[in-house]
């Protein structure tokens, strides 16, 4: 049934053809079940394990590696002699890498619990219905409830469907619907229609929503919608329709993979075609087929060389280390790739309650009457420090501390706050904080009483647990609460009837203490309290009181005001009818006005600084709240989102105002606005969508079930540690301390991680460029193989992998939060950097080939062949006079490969030092700024020595131990790469860098 809230109870009953007293007939139940289906949320069909495994092989680079492994495997079958074992090592290692990668990928996907499944926890098991086949109420499974059913709910029940209330069977009906609307206090419900068909859920005061809890009272209602038709069902559908986009880094790596795979394919084909003339060379036994296979193997080696196999592992490690650092700052990251996305966040959409504010209501102002002289009324105004539930703070008058016990009016005000109250404070020893027990508003009054300490109770020697309610206990010992007249909507107040305790010798009789909305309470006051006397409440005095309340309730503070009053001579208890709430109004008359307290949910202390940090970092903060617009704008001014006197006409909207704009203007509003008030969850998703259309990277906070679709849609969904399981499972990050400042710290960490990742991705890629150049040169010049695939795999995975991981520990730049967010479209490697890495890669390739050639041409223990013999080694036979006196086996010796590999590894270690900073010289940023990098270089070199000097590794890798002369040659060839990169950095710093960047550095 659509818009049930706007219809009368009679219309709702008529729509389903049902009687409130008897309920649906079995026939109607059957028909409605067929029409509307079961009252449950359908489970989401997850991917099968096999589908997840297949998904891991959709990446182009992975497919190329898989193809290379298969080809290597086939070629290994054709190997002869002692080469057979080494031939199988390469495909085996590649397959191991791919399997490990797939396992990690599948594990991560499986671990991301399903937010839709988490919604199930809000589905109640049972419901109580009236049906025509039974005289009394019956308990049935909640899934069998159908639209039209007459349902009964009572305190403690979970609402089984979306229900239009027909009758309230208690004084009041309070519902905790925070999971759905984010309202921190329970909501009082009624039965009258809400005539606005577009009312937001917060305003549908005659509806009960599926999954919410009855906090107090008992009611009867008719089921309007079930299953996916409910508000919680709509949230489920929104979440199911939201596709997870790839993070900017994943997109960059995908693009890079595609480009790389095209380049690899071209080079492999080129190498094979260049050497067609050599297929018949004698070294292949004159067999064209064997020649083709040989060059095919070289092409495969090229593919292996060009792909940075270690990259996925290094990225995962770097992100995992980042998440550990973030966890120490109270940001728990649930999805690894989102660590990097945080770095390009350009907009943070934050909830107000609990994130920007403490979510701990606190009284910050109060007033009592000081003097009434004719029409002149003077007030005593006080301010109170302390913005949490902790009983710590001072009462100030004109900014100077005062002792509240010296003011009779404050003693009475404290008495009303303590007695007209069902809440208390509790010290949570595990967390070391004071928490509320009961309603937030009442707990604020309890805390106020503790801060005022009107009877000067000695609290210094008390433990924190005893301190929690010490001053309230003193007041409760003086007066005994007899009974409570519950809050009701018509009078907007509640009261308690108290009698003096036996032990108290004070000459006071019974009293009624009242608290409630100022306009309602003051209208029923005939007197005002001045000191210990009461004087009549005249028109001018009332105007003065209401003027102050209006001033407090608007403007910068927008405080929530409560009026406190006493009925000095209430009727006798036996004369009062307590089971008829309609008569409570007549008992709460002839009141004496005592004072007013103004409270608010105060901003967190550290938020203002964090918002300034965001402004410096080019990040826009948008506050989104269910509160009214005035309160929202006031908090924005208080924390620095808006300036003190800034005009906010086109920068703050309510959900209704936003909906009334044409679509183009809605989109434009999202570009400007910094405050959205009175919003529904659907608005959050819409705002994210519009921001994404401007290529903004959005972080969205939320804690309720209602926030889950927007959390899932935003690039970074941030759930509160105190939030619902659904919000947490739909998000990428959870704030353990619910604090906005933690988001800013996480963004800073994300930026640092991206900078470091850029360094090691470039480091690994320049290494691969070097390997490709090496293989291409040997093939193009007709030289013997300098590096074989198994050696390339070792370098890519192990010796390069360790320094690359250590580069993730580079310290962040000092000005990291003074720059605007990077564009998600910014390429990983720009034009100049591409040239730089080609230059370095070219040197690496040439040096590696040069080291192998040096052994053939000049080494003492080498064959001393000439250059022509070296480039035509394929034609070497015993009969060929050009190779007279040369053993043809020498061209397959392991020494030149060892020289080439050692040069490659040493250059890579130098390159790792070059990667400490993109443009800073090693003289400005010495190696010891990252001690992890030095350690990893030592470890990589140790592993290189291991495969050179420890049997049987040299046989597997086709290597031979080097002597001192050869090592000196390796260093001579390798070290110039540092000088080359220093020259390139110098050019970048002085001739290419943006002057703005220069100034910032």
From Swiss-Prot:
It is an enzyme of class 7 (translocase). Inhibited by sarcolipin (SLN) and myoregulin (MRLN). Has also been shown to be reversibly inhibited by phospholamban (PLN) at low calcium concentrations in vitro. Dephosphorylated PLN decreases the apparent affinity of the ATPase for calcium and this inhibition is regulated by the phosphorylation of PLN in vitro. Enhanced by DWORF; DWORF increases activity by displacing sarcolipin (SLN), phospholamban (PLN) and myoregulin (MRLN). Mg(2+) binds at residues 351, 353, 703. It comes from the Eukaryota. Its EC number is 7.2.2.10. Residues 788-808, 932-943 are annotated as: Interaction with PLN. Disulfide bonds join 876-888. It is found in: Endoplasmic reticulum membrane; Sarcoplasmic reticulum membrane. Its cofactor is Mg(2+). The modification Phosphothreonine is found at residues 441, 569. Its main location: endoplasmic reticulum. It is a multi-pass membrane protein. One of its GO terms (cellular component) is sarcoplasmic reticulum membrane. Ca(2+) 1 binds at residues 304-305, 307, 309, 796, 800. It is linked to Brody disease: An autosomal recessive muscular disorder characterized by exercise-induced muscle stiffness and cramps primarily affecting the arms, legs, and eyelids, although more generalized muscle involvement may also occur. Ca(2+) and ATP binding cause major rearrangements of the cytoplasmic and transmembrane domains. According to the E1-E2 model, Ca(2+) binding to the cytosolic domain of the pump in the high-affinity E1 conformation is followed by the ATP-dependent phosphorylation of the active site Asp, giving rise to E1P. A conformational change of the phosphoenzyme gives rise to the low-affinity E2P state that exposes the Ca(2+) ions to the lumenal side and promotes Ca(2+) release. Dephosphorylation of the active site Asp mediates the subsequent return to the E1 conformation. Belongs to the cation transport ATPase (P-type) (TC 3.A.3) family. Type IIA subfamily. Key regulator of striated muscle performance by acting as the major Ca(2+) ATPase responsible for the reuptake of cytosolic Ca(2+) into the sarcoplasmic reticulum. Catalyzes the hydrolysis of ATP coupled with the translocation of calcium from the cytosol to the sarcoplasmic reticulum lumen. Contributes to calcium sequestration involved in muscular excitation/contraction. Interacts with sarcolipin (SLN). Interacts with phospholamban (PLN). Interacts with myoregulin (MRLN). Interacts with DWORF. Interacts with VMP1. This is Sarcoplasmic/endoplasmic reticulum calcium ATPase 1. It comes from Homo sapiens. The gene is ATP2A1.
């Amino acid at each position: 049934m659509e818009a049930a809230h706007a219809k009368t109870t009679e219309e709702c009953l008529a729509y389903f053809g049902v009687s409130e007293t008897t309920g649906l007939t079995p026939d109607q139940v059957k028909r409605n079940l067929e029409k509307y289906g079961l009252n449950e949320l359908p489970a989401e069909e997850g991917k099968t394990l096999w589908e997840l495994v297949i998904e891991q092989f959709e990446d182009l680079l992975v497919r190329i590696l898989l193809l290379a492994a298969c080809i290597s495997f086939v070629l290994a079958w054709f190997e002869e002699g002692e080469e057979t074992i080494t031939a199988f090592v390469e495909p085996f290692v590649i397959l191991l890498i791919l399997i490990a990668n797939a396992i990690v990928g599948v594990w991560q996907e499986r671990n991301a619990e399903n937010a839709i499944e988490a919604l199930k926890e809000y589905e109640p098991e049972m419901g109580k219905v009236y049906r025509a086949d039974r005289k009394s109420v019956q308990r049935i499974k909640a899934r069998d409830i159908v639209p039209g059913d007459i349902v009964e709910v009572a305190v403690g029940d979970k609402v089984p469907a979306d229900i239009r209330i027909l009758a309230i069977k208690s004084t009041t009906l309070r519902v905790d619907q925070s999971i759905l609307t984010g309202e921190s206090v329970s909501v009082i419900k009624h039965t009258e229609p809400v005539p606005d068909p577009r009312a937001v859920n917060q305003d549908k005061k005659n509806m009960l929503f599926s999954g919410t809890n009855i906090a107090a009272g008992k009611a009867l209602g008719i089921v309007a919608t079930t299953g996916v038709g409910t508000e919680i069902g709509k949230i489920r559908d929104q979440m199911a329709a939201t596709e997870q986009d790839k993070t900017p880094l994943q997109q960059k790596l995908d693009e890079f993979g595609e480009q790389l795979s095209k380049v690899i394919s071209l080079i492999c084909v080129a190498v094979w075609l260049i050497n067609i003339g050599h297929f018949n060379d004698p070294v292949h036994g004159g067999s064209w087929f064997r020649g083709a296979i040989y060059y095919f193997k070289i092409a495969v080696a090229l593919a292996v060389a060009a792909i940075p196999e270690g990259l996925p592992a290094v990225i995962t490690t770097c992100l995992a280390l980042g998440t550990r650092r973030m966890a120490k700052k109270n940001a728990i990251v649930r999805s690894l790739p989102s660590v990097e996305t945080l770095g390009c966040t350009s907009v943070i959409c934050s909830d107000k309650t609990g994130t920007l504010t403490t979510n701990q209501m606190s009284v910050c102002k109060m007033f009592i009457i000081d003097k009434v002289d004719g029409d002149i009324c003077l007030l005593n105004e006080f301010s109170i420090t302390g913005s949490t539930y902790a009983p710590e703070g001072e009462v100030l008058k004109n900014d100077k501390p005062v002792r509240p016990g010296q003011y009779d009016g404050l003693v009475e005000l404290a008495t009303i706050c303590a007695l007209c109250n069902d809440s208390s404070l509790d010290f949570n020893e595990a967390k070391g904080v004071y928490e509320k027990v009961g309603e937030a508003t009442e707990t604020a009054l309890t805390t106020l009483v503790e801060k005022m300490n009107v009877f000067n109770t000695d609290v210094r020697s008390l433990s924190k647990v005893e301190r929690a309610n010490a001053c309230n206990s003193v007041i409760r010992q003086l007066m005994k609460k007899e009974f409570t007249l519950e809050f009701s909507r018509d009078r907007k107040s509640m009261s308690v009837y108290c009698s003096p305790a036996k032990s108290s010798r004070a000459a006071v009789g019974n009293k009624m203490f009242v608290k409630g909305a100022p306009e309602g309470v003051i209208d029923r006051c005939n007197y005002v309290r001045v000191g210990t006397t009461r004087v009549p409440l005249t028109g001018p005095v009332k105007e003065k009181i209401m003027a102050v309340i209006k001033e407090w309730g608007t403007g910068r503070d927008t405080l929530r005001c409560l009026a406190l009053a006493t009925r000095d001579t209430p009727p006798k208890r036996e004369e009062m009818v307590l089971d008829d709430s309609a008569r409570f109004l007549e008992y709460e008359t002839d009141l004496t006005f005592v004072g007013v307290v103004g409270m608010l949910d105060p901003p967190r202390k550290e938020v203002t600084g964090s918002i300034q940090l965001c402004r410096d970092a080019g990040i826009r903060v948008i506050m989104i709240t269910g509160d009214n617009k005035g309160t929202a704008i006031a908090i924005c001014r208080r924390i620095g989102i808006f300036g003190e006197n800034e005009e906010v006409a086109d920068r703050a909207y309510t959900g209704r105002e936003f909906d009334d704009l044409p679509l183009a203007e809605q989109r434009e509003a999202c570009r400007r606005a910094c405050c959205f008030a009175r919003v529904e969850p659907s608005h959050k998703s819409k705002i994210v969508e519009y921001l994404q259309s401007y290529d903004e990277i959005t972080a969205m906070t939320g804690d309720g079930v209602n926030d889950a679709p927007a959390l899932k849609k935003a690039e970074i969904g941030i759930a509160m540690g105190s939030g619902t399981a659904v919000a947490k499972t739909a998000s990428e990050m959870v704030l353990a301390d619910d604090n906005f400042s933690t988001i800013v710290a996480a963004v800073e960490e994300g930026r640092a991680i991206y900078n470091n990742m850029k360094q090691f991705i470039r480091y690994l890629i320049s290494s691969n460029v070097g390997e490709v150049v090496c293989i291409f040169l040997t093939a193009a010049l007709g030289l013997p193989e300098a590096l074989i695939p198994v050696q390339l795999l070792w370098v890519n995975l192990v010796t390069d992998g360790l320094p690359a991981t250590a580069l993730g520990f580079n310290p962040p730049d000092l000005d990291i939060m003074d720059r605007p967010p990077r564009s998600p479209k910014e390429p990983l490697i720009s034009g100049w950097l591409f040239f730089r890495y080609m230059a370095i890669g070219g040197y690496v390739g040439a040096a590696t080939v040069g080291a192998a050639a040096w052994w053939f041409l000049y080494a003492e223990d080498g064959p001393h062949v000439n250059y022509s013999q070296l480039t035509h080694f394929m034609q070497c036979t015993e009969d060929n006079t050009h190779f007279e006196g040369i053993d043809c086996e020498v061209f397959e010796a392991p020494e030149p490969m060892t020289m080439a590999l050692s040069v490659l590894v040493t250059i890579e270690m130098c390159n790792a030092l070059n990667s400490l900073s993109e443009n800073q010289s090693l003289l400005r940023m010495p190696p010891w700024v990252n001690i992890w990098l030095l350690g990893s270089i030592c470890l990589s070199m140790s592993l290189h020595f291991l495969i050179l000097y420890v049997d049987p590794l040299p046989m597997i890798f086709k290597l031979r131990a080097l002597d001192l002369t050869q090592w000196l040659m390796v260093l001579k060839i390798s070290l110039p790469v540092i000088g080359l990169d220093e020259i390139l950095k110098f050019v970048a710093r002085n001739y290419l860098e943006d002057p703005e960047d220069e100034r910032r550095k």
